[in-house]
Amino acid sequence: MSKILNRSLAVETTVLPNGLKIITESMPGARSLSLGLWLRSGSRRETAAENGISHFIEHMLFKGTERRSTQEIARELDTIGGYSDAFTGKEIVSFNAKALDEHAAHAFDILSDMMLRPLFREEDMGKEQGVVLEEIKMDLDSAESQTHELFCKKFWKEDALGWPILGSPKTVKSFHPKMLREYWGRHYVPDNLLITAAGKVKHAAFVKMVDAVMGGMKKGEALPPLPEVKVFPQLARKTKPSLEQAQLCIAAPSYPMGHAKRFGCYLLNTILGGGMSSRLFQNIRERQGLVYNISSELSLYRDSGAMAIYAGTSPGTLRRVVSSVMEELRGIKNGPVSADE
């Protein structure tokens, strides 16, 4: 017997007996439905030898199931006018689809089939390793991406939060079907999954549909607790003479995702560098003309977080940009934020 935990406005939550959580939000007037299958396990759960495997499995789930080929997965979604995508983060993996409500069952069947019955064939792995290696090269060619990776590596140097989500060429080349299947078997279990639907959806009917497909999944073993994370503020530099610009990251620790004060962090992020009206954009780009891109970004995790400011400028104006950023930080620390702002 499934148990309804929450019914607030149009949002309803149910947990199946095997631990699988289902959340729906009914949106009156909508004719479409957005589906999400969320895994509470990203690159942070990997060992050093496994680094990149969460992202690689995300790719491999599109490479055919016991019931569908790669082409059939793509064709069936296109045939119903649907859309599907996936992404891997440091603490989650997401598979999502959007379709008209009349095709919701078909879209969910495709997503759940990918998640429950992947093939992990060696011949597919060889091709996908090539794809991911090209993705890594693309990141290596991006100064902005490398600045972010350098920050993570140094800031969380003793935790997997500091590792790249894509992994390294060495780890990606080492993956094999048995390794993928074992990792998938440990992590893709009901207690670690969340199913969501928003749009034209009736909660009871959606729960019944999910239960019929995934209610028989075995619980699996609970994942071990994550180690306590520490941060290491420091100065780090990486030189690449072929580039025209210097990329800058200035970051500080923030509250974790579930902290009561996180909303203040979101507001601070918006005021500092969240858009064209932000202080950093208006002062350093619009008034001084020192940069093209400048923004701030908030990265919140279960037990850690960081607020980072990113900018790109000519090497000759780097000191002025750093000085201007620090001036804005001192200003927001020492002076009140106006009601209008």
For the regions a language model picked out, list residue spans one by one.
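A secondary-structure boundary/capping signal
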Residues: 39-40, 197
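Active-site SXXK
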Residues: 52-65
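Short pre-active-site segment immediately N-terminal to the catalytic Zn-binding motif
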Residues: 41-51
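Charge-rich, well-structured scaffold segments of protease-associated domains
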Residues: 9, 15, 26, 63, ...
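Short amphipathic alpha-helix segments
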Residues: 279-287
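His/Glu-based metal-binding/catalytic segments typifying zinc-dependent metallopeptidases
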Residues: 27, 36-38, 222-279
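N- or domain-start disorder-to-order transition segments that initiate the globular core
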Residues: 1-32
